[in-house]
């Protein structure tokens, strides 16, 4: 059996100029990065239609550590819609190098449902993440320099919020000490590193509507507090212009293609467990103005990326999804039903039935928004007909229909039934209802998310988190949207509690204000903003030969 990268290398890629033409872009509206990649210029003339296209949101159940093929289904569905003569584009996130070299691998789909050039996209791509890392760490250096150069802003080194970042999973960097070496080396203080995708600049990039909006958002970033506990912003430091210059190209969406030559815009890459988990506003809106159907995804499960897409991105995008597709796998549902990861290839209808509660809670949560919901079963070779039928029967009680997809093996041809259902559902009038109101308090928003999306009873705040909310109210931050930083494997804040637990509370240990992005991050349980590497990192299997042929990427 061919690997993902072998399949990607075996298919002829069209010149990116031809893909741009297919998408409806003129030659002067793109900046080619070689033969097969391009940046799309931020030009209002790109508007081709008065009405936006249909928006299809692909999300999933709580995944296993290997993922459930959400990106694969997203790509396969878009290819299937094009096979049905619907002008379709994809809007995806950029992969982070950390997971590519770590456990999960890349984020370009799989099999015959991939975006290409697969290796480039999963590695350095067009340099967006490098630009973000440079801008973020430039701000960190400028902040420390201000303290070293007489500290005119009276910044308290003990209350600095702005860590450094690197796009690698490196647990050794979570807690570091900087400024050692005497007076010429700065002011000693405790610091740490986050992974680049956790940077507020990444969130800002994906939520900005244009270059100047990004600049204004950067000004609002809170980097720390003074000795009198007043917030210090980038505007106070006076460096928003320099940071925006570093990101002037990164804000431009990237154009690539699928193996079936469907145009794909890949831009931005915040994780959904520690940030909002969506691609950029600019990428999605550009696709909506060019295509009749746009298939996009949100990171991890519907409890994380799905909820954040609907409650954080949609108000800024100005467009609600026309259909939501929840990706499920027999393997993951059996895992939620108690089967060990090593035994998931064996038929176990009883465990599958037990695990279906996880899918049921996701269906209940997504139905709450008033958008038509479908289920896509991403089929594996070990799945039996009996197991597939159990899922199809179960979802009917939630008003949904489940469709088996085989896009890994067949590409768009493996999702034609799903595509037909998406076309039919998207023709209906959706009655979108937000989960909470903008002026709800932070605690009300938190409780609503836990009760409605997770199926729990509410939240429990640490003493620190309670004090922070009091301070936020004083600063006028207490009604910002909420980003829950939570494990992706469970509805709870404990990764080991699978299925659909009841009667639980989510423990909020602290908040991180992200004024530039425009939300509050609630850190739950033991969630980390700098991941670590597994015992067997994917990097151990990646290699390159004398001809430059890469192996081991997935």
UniProtKB/Swiss-Prot annotation:
One of its GO terms (biological process) is tetrahydrofolate interconversion. ATP binds at residues 64-71. PROSITE patterns: FTHFS_1, FTHFS_2. The keyword ATP-binding applies. It catalyses: (6S)-5,6,7,8-tetrahydrofolate + formate + ATP = (6R)-10-formyltetrahydrofolate + ADP + phosphate. InterPro entries: Formate_THF_ligase, Formate_THF_ligase_CS, P-loop_NTPase. Keywords: ATP-binding, Ligase, Nucleotide-binding, One-carbon metabolism. It holds the Pfam family FTHFS. CDD domains: FTHFS. Its EC number is 6.3.4.3. GO terms for molecular function: ATP binding; formate-tetrahydrofolate ligase activity. It comes from the Bacteria. Transmembrane segments: none annotated. It is an enzyme of class 6 (ligase). Pathway: One-carbon metabolism; tetrahydrofolate interconversion. Disulfide bonds: none annotated. Belongs to the formate--tetrahydrofolate ligase family. This is Formate--tetrahydrofolate ligase. The lineage of its organism: Bacteria, Bacillati, Bacillota, Bacilli, Lactobacillales.
């Amino acid at each position: 059996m061919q690997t993902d990268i072998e399949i990607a290398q075996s298919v002829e890629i069209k010149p990116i100029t031809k893909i741009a033409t297919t998408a409806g872009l003129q030659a002067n509206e793109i900046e080619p990065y070689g033969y097969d990649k391009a940046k799309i210029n931020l030009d209002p003339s790109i508007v081709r239609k008065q009405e936006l296209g249909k928006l299809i949101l692909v999300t999933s159940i709580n995944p296993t550590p290997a993922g459930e093929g959400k990106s694969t289904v997203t790509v396969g569905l878009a290819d299937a819609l094009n096979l049905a003569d619907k002008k379709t584009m994809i809007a995806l996130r950029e992969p982070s190098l950390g997971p590519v070299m770590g456990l999960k691998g890349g984020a370009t789909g799989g099999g015959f449902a991939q975006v290409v050039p697969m290796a480039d996209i999963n590695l350095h791509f067009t340099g967006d993440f490098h630009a973000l890392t440079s801008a973020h760490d430039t701000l960190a250096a400028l902040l420390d320099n201000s303290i070293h150069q007489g500290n005119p802003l009276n910044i308290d080194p003990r209350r600095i919020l702005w860590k450094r970042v690197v796009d690698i999973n490196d647990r050794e960097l979570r807690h570091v000490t900087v400024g050692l070496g005497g007076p010429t080396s700065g002011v000693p203080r405790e610091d740490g590193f986050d992974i680049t995708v956790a940077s507020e600049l990444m969130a800002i990039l994906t939520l900005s509507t244009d270059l100047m909006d990004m600049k204004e958002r950067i000004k609002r970033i809170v980097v720390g507090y003074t000795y009198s506990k007043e917030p210090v912003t980038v505007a106070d430091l006076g460096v928003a212009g320099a940071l925006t210059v570093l990101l002037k190209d990164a804000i431009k969406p990237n154009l690539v293609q699928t193996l079936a030559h469907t145009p794909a815009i890949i831009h931005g890459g915040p994780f959904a467990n520690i940030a909002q988990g969506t691609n950029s506003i600019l990428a999605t809106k550009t696709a909506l103005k060019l295509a009749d159907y746009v298939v996009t995804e949100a990171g991890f499960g519907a409890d994380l990326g799905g909820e954040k897409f609907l409650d954080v991105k949609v108000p800024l995008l100005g467009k609600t999804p026309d259909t939501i597709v929840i990706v499920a796998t027999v393997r993951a549902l059996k895992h939620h039903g108690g089967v060990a990861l090593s035994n998931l290839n064996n038929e176990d209808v009883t465990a599958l039935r037990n695990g279906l509660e996880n899918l049921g809670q996701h269906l209940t949560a997504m139905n709450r928004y008033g958008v038509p919901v479908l289920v896509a079963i991403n089929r594996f070779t070990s799945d039996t007909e009996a197991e597939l039928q159990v899922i199809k029967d179960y979802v009917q009680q939630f008003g949904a229909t489940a469709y088996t997809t085989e896009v890994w093996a067949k590409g768009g041809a493996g999702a034609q039934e799903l595509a037909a259902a998406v076309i039919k559902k998207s023709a209906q009038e959706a009655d979108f209802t937000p989960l909470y109101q903008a002026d709800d308090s932070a605690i009300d928003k938190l409780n609503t998310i836990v009760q409605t999306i997770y199926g729990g009873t509410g939240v429990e705040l640490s003493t620190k988190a309670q004090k922070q909310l009091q301070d936020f109210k004083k600063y006028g931050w207490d009604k910002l949207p909420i980003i829950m930083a939570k494990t992706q494997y469970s509805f709870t804040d404990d990764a080991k509690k699978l299925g659909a637990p009841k009667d639980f509370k989510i423990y909020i240990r602290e908040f991180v204000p992200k004024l530039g992005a425009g939300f509050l991050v609630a850190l739950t349980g033991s969630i980390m903003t700098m991941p670590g590497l597994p015992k067997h990192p994917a990097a151990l299997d990646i290699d390159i030969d004398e001809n430059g042929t890469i192996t081991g990427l997935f």
